[in-house]
């Protein structure tokens, strides 16, 4: 009996000496379904619970800046890199271990100058088109050519999309400011704006317009749900290092103000790991950046996209693109 009591007391002492893992709060600007899938996988692997506070990335970045050191967030998970760059410029992010950053480092993948955020997945800008009206040979070799009278009331776009804004940045970098403004004014005059990429896709599927500029994963999700044989649309990849072939990136960071930095860093490391990337790409047709992971969706190989090696990674680039949208009358 005495021996049993000693073992019980020893077990209790060891339990008390082991610090409990803290739950973490993630400000989530990524699509909620994807973030929830990764959060659930992380909790199963570590026992650490994750609370998601989901909203648009720009909105959350602004909220974090306003909250400052009082922010309850431990991690910021963003669908776009510019939102992370905003917080990095404000010195609100914690440096990450090289082991985490190196998990997804690759050709063309943006890297934080301060090593305080990590890129996690990519999405390709594409042209979705109605196969009842068009074939591949009818489509343009450059995204710039869709902002012309030929495509009047035939081409759709989502000007409030973060990826659309990043595409403007790419045009500025590759073709110059004048070309970017001309493109925006052309789309404004000849194209049809939609509130979301998914709405633009549905407009093409319904035959309302002939084509639209969207991100690849909207079509892949739609085709998986309906069955690819049952949809009237297909994707066209512009290639040729054109701005229309742009790949945009999601990423994550740990906040300096976090009271649970160890757990937060474990979560970001998990996002970049094979296990985390598999959880993400099982539910969403984004390109995993960890080279050891292959998507469950039938994606065009990222090496064949011939994407331009540019990305929006600074606050000033994003602000410049926003001003161009204003000049074109889109905002």
Curated annotation (Swiss-Prot):
Keyword Ribosomal protein found: no
Compartments it resides in: Periplasm
Gene Ontology terms for molecular function: metal ion binding
Single GO biological process annotation from the record: iron ion transport
Gene3D superfamilies: Periplasmic binding protein-like II
UniProt family annotation: Belongs to the bacterial solute-binding protein 1 family.
Name of this chain's protein: Major ferric iron-binding protein
Species classification: Bacteria, Pseudomonadati, Pseudomonadota, Betaproteobacteria, Neisseriales
């Amino acid at each position: 009996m005495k021996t049993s009591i000693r073992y019980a007391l020893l077990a209790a002492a060891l339990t008390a000496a082991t610090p409990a893992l803290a739950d973490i709060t993630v400000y989530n600007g990524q699509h909620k379904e994807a973030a929830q899938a990764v959060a659930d996988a992380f909790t199963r692997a570590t026992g650490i619970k994750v609370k998601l506070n989901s909203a648009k990335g720009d909105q959350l970045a602004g909220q974090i800046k306003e909250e400052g050191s009082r922010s309850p967030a431990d991690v910021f998970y963003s669908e776009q890199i510019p939102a992370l760059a905003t917080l990095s410029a404000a010195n609100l992010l914690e440096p990450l271990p090289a082991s985490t950053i190196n998990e997804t480092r690759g050709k063309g993948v943006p890297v934080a100058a301060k090593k305080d955020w990590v890129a996690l997945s990519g999405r390709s800008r594409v042209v979705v088109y109605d196969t009842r009206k068009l074939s591949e040979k009818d489509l343009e070799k450059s995204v710039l050519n869709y902002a012309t009278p030929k495509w009047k009331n035939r081409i759709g776009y989502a000007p409030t999309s973060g990826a659309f804004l990043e595409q403007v940045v790419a045009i500025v970098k590759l073709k110059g400011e004048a070309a970017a403004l001309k493109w925006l004014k052309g789309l404004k005059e000849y194209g049809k704006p939609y509130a979301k990429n998914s709405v633009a896709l549905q407009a093409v599927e319904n035959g309302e317009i002939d084509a639209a500029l969207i991100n690849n994963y909207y079509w892949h999700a739609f085709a998986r749900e309906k069955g690819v044989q049952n949809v009237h649309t297909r994707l066209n990849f512009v290639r040729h290092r054109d701005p229309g072939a742009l790949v945009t990136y999601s990423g994550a960071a740990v906040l300096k103000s976090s009271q649970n930095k160890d757990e937060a860093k474990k979560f970001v490391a998990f996002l970049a790991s094979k296990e985390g990337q598999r959880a993400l790409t099982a539910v969403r047709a984004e390109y995993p950046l960890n080279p050891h992971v292959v998507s469950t969706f039938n994606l065009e190989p990222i090496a064949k996209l011939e994407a331009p090696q540019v990305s929006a990674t600074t606050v000033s680039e994003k602000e410049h693109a926003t001003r161009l949208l204003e000049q074109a009358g889109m905002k």
